[in-house]
Amino acid sequence: MASPLQIRDHLQESYADVYTAEALAALTALAPLDVRRRERMAERLARRRERAAARRPLAFLDPDTLIPGTTIRVGEARAGEFDGSEIPPDLERQWIQGTGPATKPHAPVATGLRNVAYALLSGADGWMFDGEDALGQIATMSLDNLRNLRLAIAGDPLFLTVAEQVAAEMNAWAEGFFGRPIIADWRRQLDFTTRIFRCRGLHLDDRHLRHGDGSGFSASIADLCLYVVNNQAALRAAGRSVVLYLPKIQTAGEAALWNELLSALESHLGLPDGTIKAYVLVEQLEACFQLMEIRAALGRHFVGYNTGRWDYINSVADACAWDPGFVNPNIDAITMTYGYMRIYEDRVRRAVNTPDRNGRCALWQGGMETNIPVGTEAGVQAGMARAVAGAEREQRAGASGKWVAHWKMVHIVRPVWERVGEANQLGRVFPPLTYTPAAAADLTLLEPAPRTVRGARDLISVALQYGNAFAQGQQAAALKPADFFLDDDVLYLMEDMA
């Protein structure tokens, strides 16, 4: 039997609306699975050390082996011999998903709720409220984030008051930028956007919870229980799905552990298996070697993949750190059409469009648009043209939609999918995935591109700026290299922990 949980600094009293009796019961029920989480993380580090010592690149799995934590063989997963999920109605059209936290550092509740109001009034088809990379991990921000989401999802009067004020401010900005308002009826607009939550990754411990013996407690389990338990009834009563984003998954074995956590929580709450839906961010090179296996391991919970950029570039560099011949070019040269990034995106779209045994495919949500329309007129025009061109490329490539890092970008990028009018990419046909040595080598394909001192300066400059923001709890910050501080034609980009 699991030890009782410890909650630090009397937070159970001050956050009684987050640490509810129901949520604490779920945390206690899932706590025994934290042992398996620690085992998976130890295996992750051991694999990395072993590969580096042997100077061995990543490879595809043996098709005859079982996916750890499942009864599914690798070859069966690749052939679609598993039961996937139907796409629920409120996820069938996700042309634009916004991202960002539901609070601010050291903010009163009403101030933090402004973040939620901007998100739900933005016109985005979905909004991923972030408990991970974009959320500061100082003080009680993780709990403030969850409190604000509960207030918004429940339609608390304080949230509605804030939303009315924010709607007026958003329309004032839109009148100046577009020449028209973007919100006709703010109450009705609040109902448009699908609510999505991103938990923290399996590698992290929570800062407020401990096991009874004083050892660290999984941040993933904490986020999963505190969000789902406190909000699932209100979401389902409103006809909404319970939707998560799962970050930093590296292997199908880790995905199987997530599946076990989701199923255990559903069982604890008396919900049918597969009630909780999950997107997976493909942020790790190793995961790109196991895309069908991860889909299969998550089974009826899995609805789609998202193709990120910054985390994935970093993971490629990390996986190849043992190889002195692997040197990335300047970061601005590593676009989604560059070498290994192009291969990565192509494998993701092939994986989601491989049907399961019931003929069901999954969704591909395109990558992040980090531009924000703040700067000189010429700079904004150029930045928005790049943003629209990038969205058009992803739509043609088969993405069901993409991410934006700021609410102001929703009405700039969403028309790309509106003009086409297709709800999603389901039904498009792409070549089947291959698992040859050449396909493996392509996942670290370098192509000619600049490697310059300026590129190094840019990275160092942005890292210093981000470190300063991070220390203040601003894990999502508008940044640009210092060499361009005086050039307003060069726009700031929204960046988070990636």
Q: How does the language model describe each region?
A:
Residues 49:
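Catalytic domains of riboflavin
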